[in-house]
Amino acid sequence: MKRLSFLVTMLVALMLLASCSKQQGQQLVPEDALFVMRIDAKQASEKSGLTGDKSELSKWLKKQVKAMGLDKEVRDKVLDILDDPTKSGIDLTEPLYLYAAGDLERDPDFGIVGTMASKSNLIDLIKALDVFEVEESNGVSYCELDRDAALIFNGDWFFGGKVDDVDDMIATLKERAGGKGSLDGNKAFDKMCDKKGVMQVLFLGEGLENIPNASEMTAMMPDGLDIKDFASIVDFGLNPGEAVLEAEFVPMSQEWQKYVDKSLKAMKSIDDAQTKYISDKGLSLFLNIDPKMFLEQISNLAEAYEIDDESMEMIEDVLENFDGTASLEFSGIKDNQPSVSLYVGTKNEDALGLLLQNIGDMDEFQEVGDNQYLFPTDYDYDWESEDFSRTPTAWAALGFKNGMTYFSTDKESVFSTPREKYPVKEIKGKGLYLRFNADLFDTLAKEASGSDKQLFDALSDLFDYAECYNGEGATGVMRIVMKDKKKNPVEAIADYVKKFLD
């Protein structure tokens, strides 16, 4: 058991200490894959400060190996591998690919594939560890790891995962290596392999055909679109001072391409004027879309989503009055109430009228101006009175003014201009922009206590802000920016935790 635990530890160490520069082994991913993860182990370990001559992780692992009481031959071999991971036999200087394929409900197929550095080195390592027995079949070596799992390898590649019959799997792997039944050459897969982040994840619609309710999912899409013809790629990168996650939609048919192109045209650039009443000190959101095109998209989905005529008519009434712009701010907690303001560009007061018609009891509404109202959101109760009378203590605002239908839980903040102008350069050219400023953690910490306060303080110390927005083409981007601009998030968090533990 000690040797088995050590083997797992060693393999994790190898992944962390390895590099990744070439594009080998990707032909072993099956063509019916639903999900593929590609790992650039070297970049991940280097950017998290886990490798190098002064690597604390490497020193720690070597210390653990020496303390395990292993035979000298095994101990020396493992120490050599920690210095040079290729001596394990597995070439972790190339990408690793993890995948899920097949019928995920009845007969799922999972595996990890990659490239070999030396078949003999891997065999020597397995024999030295004395955990599994190496066997041969058709010129390929294998170890049965469990009743239905095996490690299969030759001088060029390796596979680890679910195996029903070793000989059948060997034949299948040889075919994939030759290009038959491989995902290699797939447009989306090749695009993923060209990404530069530390890790990528690919979702393939073609694989989704094998999951339950796939036909129902296609039926809920606009006419002419099929679930099998879409793919998406998520690319995760680490840079000094930030982590970046980019999600890209990859059309796999002309119909999907036309749909995406049309959808992108519905996005318009956020107007600087939308930021006038919004502060960047908390959570802020901006949107600018073409309302006519947006309504057309909803109309195309009405039947699939069973939107009845009455509801569709109400949606049309709202969107016909909508000019496409919206701005939202959450600035914290004030008097135990969330401080939220929303401004929606509308052509006239009709949208307000529609809201008032459906709001219910308006007895406590106070009209404070033309199309401007206040209504209570919190009360003090007189529990000694006969009818438990109540007195409003907090008011929200709702109305139409300056070409906008607005709502705010803080009546004092409506149409007030922040002390500092919003950093408009951050939103230039974007149609959707969401920003979370870590200053909000300071605000929340003032209202918190105990462990909650400690958490908010820690988050405020580490993070500067996070933002999400539509990027180039059919992409969405999320950036997490740290206070320390020299360290990436993994390094910064690791240093913070170490300081806390010390």
Residue ranges and their predicted role:
Residues 1-8:
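Bacterial N-terminal signal peptides that target proteins for export
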Residues 116-155, 187, 198-199, 349-402, ...:
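Short Gly/Thr-rich strand-loop-strand
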Residues 144-176, 384-421, 427, 461-479:
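A short, solvent-exposed beta-edge/loop patch
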Residues 96-100, 149-154, 222-241, 323-330, ...:
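Broad, structure-driven detector of short, well-ordered beta-strand segments within folded domains
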Residues 115-121, 162-166, 346-350, 410-412:
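Helix N-cap motif at beta-to-alpha junctions
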Residues 20-146, 183-229, 233-235, 241-337, ...:
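Structural boundary/hinge residues at secondary-structure and domain interfaces
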Residues 411-502:
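Long, C-terminal catalytic modules of enzymes
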